[in-house]
Curated annotation (Swiss-Prot):
Record has Cytoplasm as a keyword: no
Protein name per its UniProtKB record: Glycosyltransferase family 92 protein R07B7.12
Location relative to the cell: Membrane
PANTHER family: GLYCOSYLTRANSFERASE FAMILY 92 PROTEIN, GLYCOSYLTRANSFERASE FAMILY 92 PROTEIN R07B7.12
Transmembrane portions of the chain: 46-66
Organism, scientific name: Caenorhabditis elegans
Residue ranges occupied by any GT92 domain in the UniProt entry: 203-487
């Protein structure tokens, strides 16, 4: 009994009075986490007695349960388990998280009824195993409220050393909530949310990763018209972009050829303790968060969703459009959650003026390279709830169909040489074949006809003629990515446990002759909560006052 009493009060002291022997240098972070509760607990004898009674009742119930089940667990083993559990629950770090978006689904085909899904950049330092913990969500409508536990799914590469990673918080709530909150230790923070899209311009959505200091208008026009030709709809996220290019994209949006979405920087309005800059310490600038956001927006209305970069162009070689191409693969393998296309590097010649833009000449002068890259996914949104950059890290790879007879055209480089419009027209040949062309002649004619039709619009033509490819920020960003990831990973053979792929430390000089549009918003910091304080932004808008930054 003496050992029992001593161990019990060890646990009580650990939970309630860490100023005793447990409060030393090695356990200082534990002390700091519960110091807020310590004083009120010691000054309230009734609360102390209540805790002891509840604790003893729990021990008694546990022992009786073991006896009834004829399990030979000793009191020492039981208390050892309780002690380890207490230690595990208390050894967390106070961290911060940024909520990029939250959605409520009244009746989702895949998430269920009254489902909630939040995309959050979370710190891996919060818990030893982030996914083993739950988040309490409170949904309210009038005088009704419902508390539920939500799960955490982390989409990141194995052994990722970046402090912040993309996490999907998923749970259920009451019907048609007026308010959603996250609760911890009696403190709540209200979370802005919206419903997913109820319609789509196309059953095929091509999600384009967030753009920053984007200036290569030639890439954008190629991809916009190719996606449009094959029946897809582009959804593109923008952090910053050269203003003249942005103005042209807005015209395409008015034509319903694409949808532009905000991708604002994650900033913390206020904190009571030092915290690392999330944008500088998140994997790939939170690209997985943007792609998962696109998935959650369209998952109830799209049949297929693709995750591409702006320099990824897919031409369906054996079908007339994307829907036909993707349907043929998924119909043949109905249990598969996604299809996966590899990438082939190509070089294209530069076009200085939009007056010279021509798909037939661009493809005729295309240089197909031997080098390939890791590909991208097209998913069935009913079987996909979250994704990493190339594919989900949570779904079985043996249910991802790898397409072998078609490759994504990856525009690796726009050459310094000007597009030669006097060169003879010929179709580019698929690498490794002698006669199979990358694209059909009829498709090139259709692409050029579509572009010329758009170009005849006087509003479009006036804006498009102002576009200039400065080629100023692109080399800077390329070198930054090379120094921060590509060289360490591919040349020095370092893995993700040693490097955090992120280019936010790039120094981007400002030029008077280059103006950029930048996404921005109203930043909100919730009340300090343990173990996680939440932050977010509302009322996003486009700003031309920030400059050309990430």
């Amino acid at each position: 009994m003496g050992n029992f009493s001593f161990t019990m009060f060890q646990i009580l002291n650990l939970k309630m009075n860490l100023s005793l022997p447990y409060c030393n240098r090695s356990t200082g972070r534990i002390c700091s986490k519960i110091r807020l509760y310590h004083r009120s607990f010691r000054s309230n004898p009734s609360l102390q007695m209540c805790f002891i009674i509840v604790f003893l009742l729990f021990i008694f119930s546990l022992i009786m349960f073991m006896k009834l089940n004829q399990n030979s667990y000793s009191g020492k083993e039981i208390l050892g388990y309780l002690y380890e559990t207490a230690i595990d629950q208390l050894t967390y770090n106070h961290t911060h998280a940024f909520i990029t978006s939250a959605y409520y689904y009244r009746n989702s085909k895949s998430l269920g009824e009254n489902a909630v899904a939040m995309i959050v950049a979370m710190s891996q330092r919060t818990f030893k195993h982030l996914e083993n913990h739950e988040i309490t969500i409170v949904g309210s409508r009038g005088y009704q409220n419902l508390k539920t536990k939500a799960s955490i799914t982390v989409e990141t590469a194995e052994q990722m050393s970046c402090e912040y990673v993309m996490a999907l918080i998923q749970g259920i709530t009451l019907e048609i909530p007026q308010k959603l909150e996250i609760e911890s230790a009696g403190t709540r923070v209200q979370i802005p949310f919206r419903e997913p899209r109820k319609n789509s311009h196309s059953p095929v959505i091509i999600c384009i990763s967030p753009q920053f200091v984007a200036e290569k208008w030639q890439l954008f026009l190629m991809n916009i018209h190719v996606i449009r030709r094959y029946g897809g709809h582009m959804h593109i996220y923008i952090t910053s972009m050269v203003e003249k290019l942005f103005n042209v994209l807005k015209i395409y949006e008015d034509m319903e050829a694409l949808t532009i979405d905000y991708w604002i920087r994650m900033k913390l309005k206020k904190t009571s303790s030092p915290v690392a800059d999330i944008m500088k310490n998140v994997e790939w600038r939170h690209q997985a968060g943007a792609q998962t956001d696109c998935l959650l927006q369209y998952k109830e209305v799209a049949e297929f969703i693709a995750f591409f970069d702006i320099d990824d162009i897919l031409v369906p070689n054996f079908s007339h459009n994307y829907h036909q191409e993707f349907s043929s693969h998924f119909n043949a393998y109905p249990s598969y959650h996604s299809i996966f296309y590899g990438k082939r590097d190509v070089f294209v010649e530069k076009i200085s003026s939009i007056e010279d833009f021509s798909f037939r000449h661009l493809f005729s002068n295309m240089k197909i390279q031997e080098e390939t890259g890791y590909g991208k996914s097209i998913v069935n949104p009913l079987k996909y709830n979250s994704t990493w950059i190339h594919h989900s890290m949570k779904l079985p790879r043996n249910k991802m169909l790898k397409i072998m007879n078609t490759e994504i055209i990856h525009i690796k480089n726009i050459l310094d040489s000007e597009l030669n419009k006097d060169a003879p027209i010929h179709l580019p040949i698929i690498y490794g074949t002698e006669t199979e062309s990358v694209i059909r002649e009829m498709d090139l004619k259709t692409l050029d006809f579509d572009f010329q039709t758009v170009y005849q619009n006087p509003i479009y033509r006036e804006a498009a003629l102002k576009m200039i490819d400065y080629n100023f920020y692109t080399p800077i960003v390329f070198n930054c990515y090379n120094e921060s990831f590509y060289h360490p990973y591919f040349v020095e053979k370092k893995d993700f446990s040693q490097i955090c792929p992120n280019a936010d430390n790039c120094q981007l000089p400002q030029r008077e002759d280059i103006k950029c549009i930048h996404s921005d918003g109203e930043y909100v910091s919730g009340p300090e909560m343990y173990p996680i304080t939440f932050h977010y932004a509302v009322h996003p808008f486009w700003s031309n006052d920030i400059g050309c930054y990430q």
